[in-house]
């Protein structure tokens, strides 16, 4: 049993300590693949109720912790959760995803947005994180998370999930000043929100810029990277020792640029070999990832082989084992259990297969 004075395994990895195995957790480890989650969803069909009611969100956050004992427990929430606190309302429709109506398309709408006051608008976040810290103790690190400005802007401007990002790219290339104003406001709000999560108990922050991989490297440097960097800089001013993870879906073409944001860890998807990713990122950055979530549909022997291969390639320092994206909803729960069990036993498995 870990004591409050002990340092969680995941935090030790972010400090570059030499460990006998990498810490392990999964993006979307609390979710639809778990029967316990589906049962709770039947009782509480509204996503916003599940994520904004303290008791329900804590229960969901802890479901995978009780079942699999990952080294990280992430807040059950959504990257859009802080948007109403600045004046952008949203809903999440089952099978359709987020809906923002009306979408943000004019300068007048941007000018109406107001600074975020998390304690007034988002007190449930503090309550959830404080409760998770008490429940988890230091048996695992508690992670908070935020959406990056580009991805939040994409949802707000498109009004929904989409494939081609027509409206935000139209704004970027036809009215860049207006988009920069919006991105700046989002960055300020997100930095305040991240600090609030840390002050409430989050020991690590992961920033998701899910749609930045849709940008060319040139446009990433113009519309995404500066605002990621602004968020990190603002948070590091007050919380310099809190590890910061950056995840971009489809980041293979952007890897060398991601450390420029000032983050401590880059979360890599499966579109790049993790040994190559480490080489491209340099020695001063920890890496997280990067197993294809589809691997969890394979046989347990196949899953084990991919875990071993990934850990060997990533090296024995500064690596957090994770998927390259979130757990897919059809994933067999027993395979997730096997993944965690194997990851925890990896030091003996590596010795046997050396």
Curated annotation (Swiss-Prot):
Subunit-structure text: Homodimer.
Keywords: Cytoplasm, Decarboxylase, Lyase, Porphyrin biosynthesis
Cytoplasm among keywords: yes
Subcellular compartments: Cytoplasm
Pathway where this protein functions: Porphyrin-containing compound metabolism; protoporphyrin-IX biosynthesis; coproporphyrinogen-III from 5-aminolevulinate: step 4/4
InterPro entries, per database record: UROD/MetE-like_sf, Uroporphyrinogen_deCO2ase_HemE, Uroporphyrinogen_deCOase
Organism: Trichodesmium erythraeum (strain IMS101)
EC code(s) of this entry: 4.1.1.37
Gene from which this protein is expressed: hemE
CDD domains: URO-D
Record GO terms (molecular function): uroporphyrinogen decarboxylase activity
Family designation: Belongs to the uroporphyrinogen decarboxylase family.
Name of this protein: Uroporphyrinogen decarboxylase
UniProt keyword annotation of Transmembrane helix present: no
Function summary: Catalyzes the decarboxylation of four acetate groups of uroporphyrinogen-III to yield coproporphyrinogen-III.
Assigned GO CC terms: cytoplasm
GO biological process: protoporphyrinogen IX biosynthetic process
Positions with a binding annotation for substrate: 28-32, 78, 155, 210, 325
